[in-house]
Amino acid sequence: KGKCDWDDRWYASRKLDGVRCLAVVDENRVCTLYSRMGKELTTLNRVKEAIENTGIINHVFDGEICLLDENGNEDFQGVMKELRRKDHQIENPRFMIFDMIHKSEFNAGKGNTPLTERLRTLRAWQGGRFTCAKTLQYVDQVQINDDDHFETWNKLSAEKGWEGFMLRKNVGYEGKRSKNLVKVKKFHDAEYEVIDYDTDTAEVVRNGRSETIEMLSQVWIE
């Protein structure tokens, strides 16, 4: 609050409890799915086929892969477990999409097409006759009008038990961390003693190249 000029057109969307995914479609209509770290996701053929069946080419879809439990809530642990299984395909994945970028802008790492135009294109594509609406879902984006409207979203997020919500400014695509994409989340502070930790290797993309680095994977507290 206070950091955003609402006249610049900021859009809010619920922060989902899923796994970030980029679906890259080439000029031959072939779709490849990647994690945020650049690792290919091979358990999502249902999503891959659903995108390819629309006939879209040369676009990148940014969103999250979710599994819904019996109450309709995202099951983060469940989707992580399914994604890690070998020789397996997830039966009912939901690809919740919040951006659609032309591949030329994605490859350049920046673009001039504003968010509102990208969302308009995404909504039209998602509503097409060949789109499987159950597998490919559009994440609603709501323009925030003023500070009171922002506080309404803040309260809604807390009441619904959301992970938080995202704010996106109406600017062109930026393929890096940016002040034009803000995560709004309330934190509950507490102090714990770390009694042990573990590390693991992870594949990340830096300057267009894949690198394997050691990262903190988990901690034990008391």
Locations of regions flagged by a protein language model:
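Short beta-strand or tight-loop elements
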Residues: 6-8, 190-192, 217
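A short secondary-structure junction signal
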Residues: 106-112, 176-180, 205-208
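Short, conserved beta-turn/loop elements at beta-strand boundaries and strand-helix junctions
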Residues: 199-203
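Short aromatic-glycine-enriched beta-strand elements
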Residues: 205-210, 215-220
